Design a protein with these regions (language model features):
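TRNA-recognition modules of translation machinery and tRNA-sensing kinases, especially anticodon-binding
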Residues: 1-127
Length: 127
């Protein structure tokens, strides 16, 4: 299967997105959330997790699809909190902004890559 097109964010939307992200970041910080920046690349095993992500929408970046572009942020943040932040006092308040990727099959032999901006918060644990 080959990629036939990339749906990117339009230049006219970049400034609007930047303003929205800046406003959201201010709100996140007011509520005590810390910014993290998860990797664009993950193993397919990590992304698939417990079957929440549809493997057919994941964009593999090597021939055997063992590595892929992130289709969403939550999985990467959960992995971060359970590894590098394992000893951090709970609850952990994290926020992130960035691009996520998925693919849409256009026909039997090709797909379109969709690049989307995502912003969100994760509250991990409790008091």
């Amino acid at each position: 299967i080959k990629m036939t097109d990339i749906k990117e964010i339009k230049l006219v939307d970049v400034k609007n997105n930047s303003n929205i992200i800046n406003n959201l970041n201010s709100i996140y910080k007011l509520w005590g959330y810390e910014e993290v920046s998860p990797s664009f690349i993950n193993t397919l095993e990590t992304i698939k997790g417990r079957g929440i992500i549809d493997e057919n929408q994941v964009v593999g970046i090597v021939s055997n699809n063992s590595l892929c572009l992130r289709p969403e942020m939550t999985t990467s943040i959960v992995k971060l909190s359970s590894t590098r932040l394992i000893n951090k006092k709970r609850p952990i308040r994290l926020f992130t902004n960035g691009m996520v990727f998925d693919k849409k099959q256009t026909n039997e032999n090709s797909f379109k890559l969709h690049e989307k901006l995502q912003s969100g918060i994760e509250l991990i644990g409790y008091d």
